[in-house]
Amino acid sequence: MSNYGVKELTWENGQLTVHGLGDEVEPTTSNNPIWTQSLNGCETLESVVHQAALQQPSKFQLQSPNGPNHNYESKDGSCSRKRGYPQEMDRWFAVQEESHRVGHSVTASASGTNMSWASFESGRSLKTARTGDRDYFRSGSETQDTEGDEQETRGEAGRSNGRRGRAAAIHNESERRRRDRINQRMRTLQKLLPTASKADKVSILDDVIEHLKQLQAQVQFMSLRANLPQQMMIPQLPPPQSVLSIQHQQQQQQQQQQQQQQQQQFQMSLLATMARMGMGGGGNGYGGLVPPPPPPPMMVPPMGNRDCTNGSSATLSDPYSAFFAQTMNMDLYNKMAAAIYRQQSDQTTKVNIGMPSSSSNHEKRD
């Protein structure tokens, strides 16, 4: 802080003088003017403030991006802009008003360099903004972004055009192949029907189309039928009485046919036995020596399935069916078996009786 309680700045003989109340110390101003050169008419506020700032013995130089600038000139190189203070009083009031401010900031327009400080006693700080370069870089980045967006837009447009072109080419190729197939079929039809007119060909095509529609409908019906469950397609309803009666008749017919076949087999076996025994014509006398075959066991016809619906069994045509179609029961079978056994026993006894007499005759001859 300053040693003066109150201070003021005055402009005297081209120099800035400080006046104050209280204990005085050596003035910080020198008797010699700070600027050896004349102001050359540059009596602006910036010039006055520069004089106040340069009262310290140490001097500093401001550096700009383009090089050192010792004269603290503006961008134009001279103090060409004048504030227009022709009178000394106006300058004094301006300096006094500026001195009462706590912080002073001076912007040097040369090369975009800023200089700011809080008070006369505080240290100076330099800060280079380079607003021009920043604006340049900003504008350059914006330009690059814009160019990149334009390039992306052009690339997307080119890709979309390429896709459209490929799709159109594929469509044209498929259409060409379809026309070729149609033409080939028409040529084949022309070869098959060389004298047919266009109306005949159209009618043939109409018939083919109708046939294809019918086939398609049948295929759809079959697919639907296959997808439906079996119970929904054919509901299990109880069979009517007529169906039951027909099934019963068919089962009875099957049983009768089986019985007839069994009787025929039994009669054939009896005839074969009688033929071996010599009863069916002139047989040898030793036929009774051969034991008769055992009678076939009684065959019980299997019961037919009542649930079966297919009762139409094809019967074999037998020429002896009229002869053997006779009723036979167990009583007749037993009687025939007893008669055959009696005949066999009689023949065996006769043979046994005749054999000793023949042996005695041989002895007598001897």
Swiss-Prot record:
Transcription factor acting negatively in the phytochrome B signaling pathway under prolonged red light. Regulates PHYB abundance at the post-transcriptional level, possibly via the ubiquitin-proteasome pathway. May regulate the expression of a subset of genes by binding to the G-box motif. Residues 59-71, 344-360 have a biased composition (Polar residues). One of its GO terms (molecular function) is protein dimerization activity. Disruption phenotype: Plants are hypersensitive to red light, exhibiting shorter hypocotyls and larger cotyledons. Residues 166-215 form the bHLH domain. Changing E8A: Loss of binding to phyB. This is Transcription factor PIF7. It is found in: Nucleus. Induction: By red light. Stable upon light exposure. Keywords: DNA-binding, Nucleus, Phytochrome signaling pathway, Transcription, Transcription regulation. One of its GO terms (cellular component) is nuclear speck. PROSITE patterns: BHLH. Residues 59-84, 131-181, 235-261, 344-366 are annotated as: Disordered. Changing G14A: Loss of binding to phyB. InterPro entries: bHLH_ALC-like_plant (IPR031066), bHLH_dom (IPR011598), HLH_DNA-bd_sf (IPR036638), PIF1-like_bHLH (IPR047265).
